[in-house]
């Protein structure tokens, strides 16, 4: 029995199947995603989604799907499934499904009449190319496969509607055809491993409906371009179809599939699923190596990159990959800040914590490699640039106060990870001195001082040691309340916000924490009593009148709940460090129990991966991105740290 598997009863149940989503990716940044039964319920669902260099590297959905028709002894069996305006579903190709498994690649077992066949797919590891394999298990006199491409050629965040600008032509290639709907795009080539007949009948396919978009208050209807039909007659047991941005030798398609299948990480248990999921976030393109923050809609985020970096690389033994990603991000450093989203001219530097998480990730890297001089030589100038920018002042009113604390933000700005904005106003306003930012700041300076001391950088020591001397006392005086028994979330002048949030957990988790051992215990106690649940850590205590236990409704309603009680698995990263430090003897077993609560998540929502968030209230339904980098990274980090302690 496969670890990830579903039988016919589950596959023909559309309500069951559409709550489970499949994701497959290439390291070049291309990916495919849909529901278990193949019904696209989001505008982000598609068969071939590819970064477009002519559009700032943004991901564009080129191929929404295929209308597939198996012709067996002159009988038609339509395998596709679509939902149309008003909710009508036709055809219902999922009725032919018998089994699904995903050991190394996703495999669907079909039965049409008395004829059985399999369909599997994978991406070429390092290219924008998808390969679909059809394996025919029974001998039949005559079989043909008819495929109609359904094209969109649009940004993943937008929708296509019928228009007269589309290019109606096609290009003939080896055993296939190519299409390009608009100028500036890479063409898409459909090629079979066998000879193909192509009938060109260009037209629009109207009113496809995406119900998840309607739930979020967005336009949920799309028209897709259907240029024609490719027909391949089956001779032998196997037939391959490749979809790529460049044509290839059709005779090599089968060999390429076989070669790529051998490279896949099998999904035979929970741990292997996490490792496989980690690999899907890594994109190597145009001389960069980046982390995709979450599928299907997030791109590269600075904050997410550095929080996820140790778990996605060091925790699974990929030290050189850590360096590749860090070096790629450093290229975009500006005024001591990393882009929160975007790159180049489209970069947005609205993150106060990304640079501090960068230094924290270097600290974990240092703990792993223990080469202080090498680290200071390679990254010392970058660390200095960041620290000096914060001390002297940089964008978005990020600056050091006279007492050494960092102040950040202003009207309309949301610079921490609690960054949701609705109607121009932050849902979680935190302008001022934020508790985790100042703890990360202190930790960054102390770590840098250790590195500088090993390299005898006397000038740096002279400049920065004085800042740390009184910092713990200032921090405690600013954030601690003996009456409350925990740390304030942020302070702005005389105002102190004492909502119970997980940011104080970050402050208590750091190697150079500005608080005492006793205060760490009290912070951890508060977090475990009010915030820790089965699938992560709540963003706000349910005792708070602003708490929202469910993430649902329109996008504005969801954003209003995003950091107001919603559970975040990534916070298990600082929880791991804090628990192992405060309770080193009992923590490993406690953390191990938390870790394996996610085992059941591998067969729900995003298959074989971990979601971005869950509801704050039971049963903690997963939501947001189906696969989130820092969620997966937190679990891999937790697993890694538990194993280190138990050695």
Map each language-model feature to its residues.
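Aromatic- and glycine-enriched pocket-lining scaffold segments that form the walls
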Residues: 389, 433-458, 463-469
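Terminal accessory carbohydrate-recognition/targeting modules of carbohydrate-active enzymes
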Residues: 1-266, 270, 296, 303, ...
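Residue-level signal for inorganic ion chemistry
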Residues: 134, 308, 507
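Aromatic-rich carbohydrate-recognition surfaces in CAZymes
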Residues: 139, 160-163, 172, 181, ...
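Inter-helical turn/loop segments and adjacent helix faces that build the functional surface
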Residues: 365-378, 447-464, 514, 518, ...
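Extended glycan-interaction surfaces of carbohydrate-active proteins
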Residues: 195-198, 204-212, 217, 224, ...
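Solenoid-repeat scaffolds in large eukaryotic assemblies
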Residues: 322, 461, 468, 520, ...
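Short, well-ordered beta-strand elements
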Residues: 239-244, 442-445, 576
């Amino acid at each position: 029995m496969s670890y990830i598997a579903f039988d016919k009863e589950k596959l023909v149940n559309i309500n069951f199947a559409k709550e489970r989503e499949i994701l497959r990716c290439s390291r070049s940044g291309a990916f495919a995603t849909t529901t278990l039964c193949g019904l696209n319920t989001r505008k982000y669902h598609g068969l071939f989604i590819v970064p477009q260099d002519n559009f700032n590297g943004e991901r564009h959905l080129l191929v929404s799907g295929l209308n597939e028709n198996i012709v067996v002894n002159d009988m038609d069996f339509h395998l596709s499934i679509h939902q149309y305006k008003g909710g009508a579903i036709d055809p219902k190709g999922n009725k032919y499904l018998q089994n699904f498994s995903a050991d190394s690649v996703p495999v669907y077992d079909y039965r049409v009449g008395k004829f059985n066949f399999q369909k599997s797919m994978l991406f070429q590891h390092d290219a924008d190319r998808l390969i679909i394999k059809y394996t025919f298990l029974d001998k039949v006199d005559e079989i043909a496969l008819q495929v109609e491409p359904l094209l969109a050629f649009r940004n993943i965040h937008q929708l296509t509607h019928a228009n007269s600008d589309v290019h109606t032509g096609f290009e003939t290639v080896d055993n296939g055809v190519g299409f390009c709907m608009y100028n500036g795009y890479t063409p898409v080539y459909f090629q079979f491993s066998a000879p193909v007949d192509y009938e060109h009948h260009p037209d629009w396919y109207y009113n496809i409906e995406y119900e998840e978009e309607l739930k979020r208050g967005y336009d949920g209807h799309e028209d897709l371009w259907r240029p024609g039909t490719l027909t391949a007659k089956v001779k032998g047991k196997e037939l391959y179809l490749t979809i790529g941005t460049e044509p290839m030798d059709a005779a090599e398609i089968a060999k390429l599939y076989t070669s790529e299948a051998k490279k896949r990480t099998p999904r035979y248990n929970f741990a292997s699923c996490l490792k496989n999921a980690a690999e899907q976030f890594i994109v190597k393109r145009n001389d960069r190596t980046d982390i995709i923050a979450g599928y299907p809609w997030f791109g590269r985020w600075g904050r997410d990159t550095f929080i996820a970096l140790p778990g996605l690389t060091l925790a699974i033994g990929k030290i050189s990959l850590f360096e590749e990603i860090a070096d790629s991000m450093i290229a975009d450093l500006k005024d001591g800040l990393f882009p929160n989203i975007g790159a180049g001219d489209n970069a947005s530097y609205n993150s106060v914590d990304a640079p501090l998480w960068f230094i924290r990730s270097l600290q974990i890297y240092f703990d792993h490699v223990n080469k202080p001089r090498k680290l200071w030589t390679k990254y010392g100038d970058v660390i200095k640039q960041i620290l000096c920018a914060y001390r002297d002042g940089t964008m978005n009113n990020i600056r050091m106060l006279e007492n050494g604390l960092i102040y950040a933000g202003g009207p309309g700005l949301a610079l921490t990870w609690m960054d949701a904005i609705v109607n121009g106003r932050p849902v979680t306003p935190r302008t001022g001195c934020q508790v985790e930012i100042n703890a990360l700041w202190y930790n960054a300076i102390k770590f840098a001082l250790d590195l500088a001391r090993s390299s005898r950088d006397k000038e740096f020591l002279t400049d920065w040691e004085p800042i740390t001397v009184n910092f713990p006392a200032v921090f405690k005086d600013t954030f601690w309340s003996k009456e409350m028994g925990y740390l304030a979330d942020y302070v702005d002048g005389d105002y102190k916000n004492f909502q119970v949030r997980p940011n104080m957990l970050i402050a208590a988790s750091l190697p150079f924490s500005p608080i005492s051992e006793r205060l760490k215990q009290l912070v951890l106690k508060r977090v475990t009593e009010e915030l820790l649940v089965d699938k992560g850590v709540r963003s706000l205590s349910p005792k708070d009148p602003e708490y929202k236990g469910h993430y649902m409704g329109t996008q504005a309603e969801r954003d209003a709940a995003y950091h107001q009680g919603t559970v975040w698995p990534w916070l298990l990263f600082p929880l791991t460090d804090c628990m192992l430090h405060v309770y080193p003897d009992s923590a490993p077993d406690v953390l191990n129990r938390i870790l394996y609560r996610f085992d059941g998540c591998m067969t729900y929502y995003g298959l074989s991966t971990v979601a971005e968030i869950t509801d704050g209230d039971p049963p903690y339904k997963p939501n947001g991105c189906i696969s989130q980098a820092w969620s997966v990274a937190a679990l891999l980090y937790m697993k890694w740290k538990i194993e280190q302690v138990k050695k």
